[in-house]
Amino acid sequence: TEFPEVAHAMLYAGVKKLTDFQDPAYAGEYLTRMAALLAADRDNGGEAKGFAFTVAAAKYVAVAMAYDDVVRVADLKVRGTRFERVHNEVGVKDGQILYMTEYMHPRMDEVCGTLPKGLGLWIEARPKLFAFLDRRVNKGRRVKTGTLFWFSSLYFLSAMRRIRRGSLRHFREVEHREAWLHQALSVLPANYDLAVEVIATRRLVKGYSDTHARGLSKFDRVLSAVPMLQPREDGADWLRRLRQAALIDESGIALDGALKTVATL
């Protein structure tokens, strides 16, 4: 597929990001998905709009595909470039040894996410077993990543990227991503600008653990207003305001107020 020049920079960044996150084949999946989104964009007057839908999707589909999970966090913590950067920032001199202490607080739902889909679902379907395991896992730990034991442990976790596609977390990420893209595509023929904002709303989902859960909740709440906004010419502006309200207030009070306003339009 020949992508419009305006999307090239974002697509290049997306391919680079996803190759680093997983592998070249995963970046290929991204380009295949983007080709389908570009076709929908063309069919709905995207050229006259500067292919804004494709450009936004090039950025946020890559962000969605490169989600933060246990494997990603472990991978980033054992990279040589990270140790080199910290050494330079701290100013370690020749002959000195630097040990880094990381705070980690894993939860059982994150552990289940790294497991094969079937096993993860099997554990989640047994509340007593899940709670038993969570009591043993859900603890704050200060980890010295420069020691052989912890470096090896994190290195092993980072190597699980090879089986990431079969994990429960990956299954759920794909499911959520496709639901989001389906919503954007369903809006596209009727309200192009609103569809672009649906894509851009993905910026609310970021981070890891509790941060990710809060972002996901805000994302779902903001997009719940799309059916009300779709018939409106200013629907895109209102969705943008909802997203900004979600970004500026961690407590969600501003978003609650904005959603109530939209409901009265």
Located regions from the model:
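Active-site loops and adjacent core secondary-structure elements that bind or stabilize anionic groups
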Residues: 1-265
